[in-house]
């Protein structure tokens, strides 16, 4: 397999490309920008495309994928596409309809990976972020093991080739893994992960269970208000990353991406900028030394850009535990 399409084998036998293209964009970015960016990513060599119902862009991402299939650049089986189940569809009876809705938006027959996006359940309905008249989130109480059983049925129906989770902590992963009658383990846990939050303990736990850790916000974060603290440090300006970038004649972003690949983490790179999209593919062209890796390990300072604290309160809020 050529280096551009390096893959990791998942615990269900499917393969996931280790470098993925993230399609999330802040609200002010026009949704149709996702068409051009996704096409550019596929042309540049990305084969793993990550989106979600929450991002409101699946029809555009699907359009881009289908146009690259139509023009002969790729076949459907070359693309590894991830979607995610949003919190308002955790009740088991809503899981398959939510996936079918994503597939309809995408105009695809299946997704390669379907994830439970976040472990806190919200009130079912059309509203993605349902609130009461005082602006308080409207939560729901759902047993995530029941949600997981509905996810397993989606895999059995062929609507999703693989199933996994996102933003789960160790306790929540164990709850699924220890579920009586478990049919399929989650293939991955997609979490925020970068040199300032390197998730060492969660990574070791996932590896011990043959669950792949997938890193989002691997380059820091989009810094979107109101989600991200505007005073948080900018990862890509870190002196250690900048020094390593200079040493390897690469960008700090490439150093941050390469770091994840070398520790066995699948990494998502989000950019709508053509030059940076192409640049990010160069992560396969160089290697960091063990000293480089140690230096980056030393940057860990437990800085979480996406605390999602509007979801704090319910027992399923994942970020109160150590990991």
Swiss-Prot record:
GO terms for molecular function: 17-alpha,20-alpha-dihydroxypregn-4-en-3-one dehydrogenase [NAD(P)+] activity; 3-beta-hydroxy-5-beta-steroid dehydrogenase (NADP+) activity; 5-alpha-androstane-3-beta,17-beta-diol dehydrogenase (NADP+) activity; androstan-3-alpha,17-beta-diol dehydrogenase (NAD+) activity; androsterone dehydrogenase (B-specific) activity; bile acid binding; carboxylic acid binding; estradiol 17-beta-dehydrogenase [NAD(P)+] activity. One of its GO terms (cellular component) is cytosol. InterPro entries: AKR, AKR1C, Aldo/ket_reductase_CS, NADP_OxRdtase_dom, NADP_OxRdtase_dom_sf. Pfam families: Aldo_ket_red. Substrate binds at residues 24, 117, 222, 227. NADP(+) binds at residues 20-24, 50, 166-167, 190, 216-222, 270-280. Transmembrane segments: none annotated. Keywords: Cytoplasm, Lipid metabolism, NADP, Oxidoreductase. GO terms for biological process: bile acid metabolic process; digestion. Coiled coil: none annotated. The record marks 54 as: Important for substrate specificity. Pathway: Steroid metabolism. It catalyses: a 3alpha-hydroxysteroid + NADP(+) = a 3-oxosteroid + NADPH + H(+); a 3alpha-hydroxysteroid + NAD(+) = a 3-oxosteroid + NADH + H(+); (17R,20S)-17,20-dihydroxypregn-4-en-3-one + NADP(+) = 17alpha-hydroxyprogesterone + NADPH + H(+); (17R,20S)-17,20-dihydroxypregn-4-en-3-one + NAD(+) = 17alpha-hydroxyprogesterone + NADH + H(+). Its EC number is 1.1.1.-, 1.1.1.112, 1.1.1.209, 1.1.1.210. The record marks 84 as: Lowers pKa of active site Tyr. It is found in: Cytoplasm, Cytosol. Belongs to the aldo/keto reductase family. Monomer. Cytosolic aldo-keto reductase that catalyzes the NADH and NADPH-dependent reduction of ketosteroids to hydroxysteroids. Most probably acts as a reductase in vivo since the oxidase activity measured in vitro is inhibited by physiological concentrations of NADPH. Displays a broad positional specificity acting on positions 3, 17 and 20 of steroids and regulates the metabolism of hormones like estrogens and androgens. May also reduce conjugated steroids such as 5alpha-dihydrotestosterone sulfate. Displays affinity for bile acids. This is Aldo-keto reductase family 1 member C1.
């Amino acid at each position: 397999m050529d280096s551009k399409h390096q893959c990791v084998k998942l615990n269900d036998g499917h393969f996931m490309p280790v470098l993925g293209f993230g399609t999330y964009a802040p609200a002010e970015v026009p949704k149709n920008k996702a068409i051009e960016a996704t096409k550019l990513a596929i042309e540049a060599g990305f084969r793993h495309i990550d989106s979600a119902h929450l991002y409101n862009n699946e029809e555009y991402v699907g359009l881009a994928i289908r146009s690259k299939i139509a023009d002969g650049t790729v076949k459907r089986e070359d693309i590894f596409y991830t979607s995610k189940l949003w919190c308002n569809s955790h009740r088991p009876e809503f899981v398959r309809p939510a996936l079918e809705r994503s597939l309809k938006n995408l105009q695809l027959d299946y997704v390669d990976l379907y994830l439970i996006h976040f472990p806190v359940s919200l009130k079912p309905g059309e509203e993605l972020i349902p609130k009461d008249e005082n602006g308080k989130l409207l939560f729901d109480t759902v047993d995530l093991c029941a949600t997981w059983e509905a996810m397993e049925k989606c895999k059995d129906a062929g609507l999703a080739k693989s199933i996994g989770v996102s933003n789960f902590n160790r306790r929540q992963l164990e709850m699924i893994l220890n579920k009586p009658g478990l049919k399929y383990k989650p293939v991955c846990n997609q979490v925020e992960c970068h040199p300032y939050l390197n998730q060492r303990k969660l990574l070791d736990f996932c590896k011990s269970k043959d669950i792949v850790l997938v890193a989002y916000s691997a380059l820091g974060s989009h810094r979107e208000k109101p989600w991200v603290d505007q005073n948080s440090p900018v990862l890509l300006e870190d002196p250690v990353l900048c020094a390593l970038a200079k040493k390897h004649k690469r960008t700090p972003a490439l150093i941050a991406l390469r770091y994840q690949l070398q520790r066995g983490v699948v990494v998502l790179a989000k950019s709508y900028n053509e030059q940076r999209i192409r640049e990010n593919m160069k992560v396969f062209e160089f290697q960091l030394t063990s000293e480089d890796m140690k230096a980056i390990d030393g940057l860990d300072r437990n800085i979480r850009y996406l605390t999602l604290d509007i979801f704090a309160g319910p027992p399923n809020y994942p970020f109160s535990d150590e990991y």
